Amino acid sequence: MLCRAACSTSRKLVPALGSLGSRQKHSLPDLQYDYGALEPYINAQIMQLHHSKHHAAYVNNLNVTEEKYQEALAKGDVTAQIALQPALKFNGGGHINHTIFWTNLSPNGGGEPKGKLLDAIKRDFGSFDKFKEKLTAVSAGVQGSGWGWLGFNKDQGRLQIVACPNQDPLQGTTGLIPLLGIDVWEHAYYLQYKNVRPDYLKAIWNVINWENVSERYMACKK
């Protein structure tokens, strides 16, 4: 199911605005590992706060915003609908991004990808090390809060690395299909790495779930 769903994460989590009247409420996804499972690279306190507080807040605020949007839609209040767009983008993006992020991590992660994903990385970036350096640099260079992404350009059939500010969702803002996201909001690392974002970015490669990233890539190739 993951393979079929990987390319449509954004579309499933944030329905078309016109269909909000019959929507189901969003819920916080369970993690497939314990909060302490990613130590020593990401400690349990960060994981617990990040998942149960920060991600949960995006989910709750998204549901509240969609309820308000539904009311505005029913009333034909276009002004209110427009005013709610930033909150839909921010909280919807936060939910989409984190739902992908948790699956991109694994206590059994690290190393290098295999098979067709590795071949594509070498084709589009020259080598795995060059890819790793570029995604690290792009993520480190995000001003303020945001994400570094490895995405798939379906039109060109190639991998691309980009940064998105705040919680802007990759597919909704660039058209790229998200494969691997690195959260560089301070809540993702500050309690452990303080203001040294590069140390966090160096550590996170040890828990990247390449199996999940590969599944997402193969799903997008179909």
From Swiss-Prot:
It catalyses: 2 superoxide + 2 H(+) = H2O2 + O2. It is found in: Mitochondrion matrix. It comes from the Eukaryota. Nitrated under oxidative stress. Nitration coupled with oxidation inhibits the catalytic activity. The modification 3'-nitrotyrosine is found at Y58. The modification N6-acetyllysine is found at K68, K75, K114, K122, K130, K202. SUPFAM superfamilies: Fe,Mn superoxide dismutase (SOD), C-terminal domain, Fe,Mn superoxide dismutase (SOD), N-terminal domain. Belongs to the iron/manganese superoxide dismutase family. Its EC number is 1.15.1.1. GO terms for cellular component: mitochondrial matrix; mitochondrion. It is an enzyme of class 1 (oxidoreductase). GO terms for molecular function: manganese ion binding; superoxide dismutase activity. PANTHER family: SUPEROXIDE DISMUTASE 2, SUPEROXIDE DISMUTASE [MN], MITOCHONDRIAL. This is Superoxide dismutase [Mn], mitochondrial. PROSITE patterns: SOD_MN. Keywords: Acetylation, Manganese, Metal-binding, Mitochondrion, Nitration, Oxidoreductase, Transit peptide, Ubl conjugation. It holds the Pfam family Sod_Fe_N. The modification N6-succinyllysine is found at K68, K75, K122, K130. Destroys superoxide anion radicals which are normally produced within the cells and which are toxic to biological systems. Mn(2+) binds at H50, H98, D183, H187. The keyword Amino-acid biosynthesis does not apply.
